[in-house]
Amino acid sequence: MSKIEELPPSDTDDHSYSSKPGDVFLAFVDAPVKETDDILVEDSFIGGEPKWLHPDSEPPAELLKCGACKSADNMKLLLQAFSPLDDEQMSAIQQRLGINNMSYINPQDDRVLYVFLCTECQRKGNSVRCIRGVKKNKNVDSLSEKMASTSLEKDFQINPFDLSNNSDSKCNAFSSNPFGGANANPFGADSINSNISQSKDEGKKKESATVSAKTARKLHDLQKDKEYDGNKCFKSCLLYVEEETFKNKKPAHLQLPKNLKIDKEALDLTGDEDLEKDPIKLDPRTEKLSKFLDDDTFQKFQEVVGYNPLQVLRYDLGGKPLLYAETKVDILSTVPRPGYNPSSQRIFEMQLMPKMIFDLEEVVSVDNGMEWGTILVFTDVENYMPEFDEHGVGYVEECVKVQWESRT
């Protein structure tokens, strides 16, 4: 059974985006991968070459082939996302679905999602594939400690678009709860005196840390970008993650006037009668624009993305996808149960955003470029793995749904 299908536009309005602020994490491009960078399993990045969970443990060859042309020659990595699970979150999601099997959910396990695309078979079934990899981790270190150690080793996650340069808001959404271990009330009576006495020292330390981070970033940017074979890979960039907020104003170019009107003289019509009979009898480009303007789902997509237009990935485990266009059927009803675990079901986990195309392609081509609007990934809520190899590594294929860019 094909795990990918085109979701055609429809006149129905059965779906709406309902995730709330705080539910969603966004990934943005941080910096190009450099020749000196040591890519780790814990890194999340777009393009480049996959980092498998063990050097001697790769997925079965069949999973690395295009499901349409049955060849691996044109399969390129779009995304590698380090996405370990939080047991409390997964328990709550399972309970909501009436499922109770936490046997395969361990926050200490390495868990990675790989998304590949065949550049020669766009719009064909199974031309985009997602592989979920899990590596059993017997270390006693907690996930938060592991992530903290990783960030210390490679801390270039400075948002170049954040004028405040406050890196505290950056976190890894593919790890456990980024808000765990919150500080006690800073306004409590016991803390006031200590805060006053420590404010100067903390201010100096924070200033020093900011300078060090800026210096590290500048030194990193001066390094040579890693080169890839364009026939096998897209260029690669590391990602950083933030919680979704709507504090930014929507860009002006995404704001459509409410009193938008179409000038009859701009249309390819023979007269007023044609306009009255068929008000959307336009040239192909104008007709395509008109269809998008009439698509409330696409307008919602633009509205939500407009607050954070640089996002390349949305992560909303157990939530609902932000659809690119209206669909004839309920997407969730078309997501199959995992064949390797038929008693379970899949949940939405993440979606790739169209901004990623511009970051991956050196030259954007109208004729030969990528044509997807968004790529949705659904994964097994039980995180089941049929078997692990001698290195404690296992790989399975997960479900992908693609909404393609309209050609009409």
Swiss-Prot record:
Disulfide bonds: none annotated. Its main location: cytoplasm. It comes from the Eukaryota. Residues 1-20, 190-214 are annotated as: Disordered. GO terms for molecular function: unfolded protein binding. It holds the Pfam family PDCD2_C. GO terms for cellular component: cytoplasm. Belongs to the TSR4 family. Required for processing of the 20S pre-rRNA at site D to generate mature 18S rRNA. Present with 125 molecules/cell in log phase SD medium. This is 20S rRNA accumulation protein 4. It comes from Saccharomyces cerevisiae (strain ATCC 204508 / S288c). The gene is TSR4.
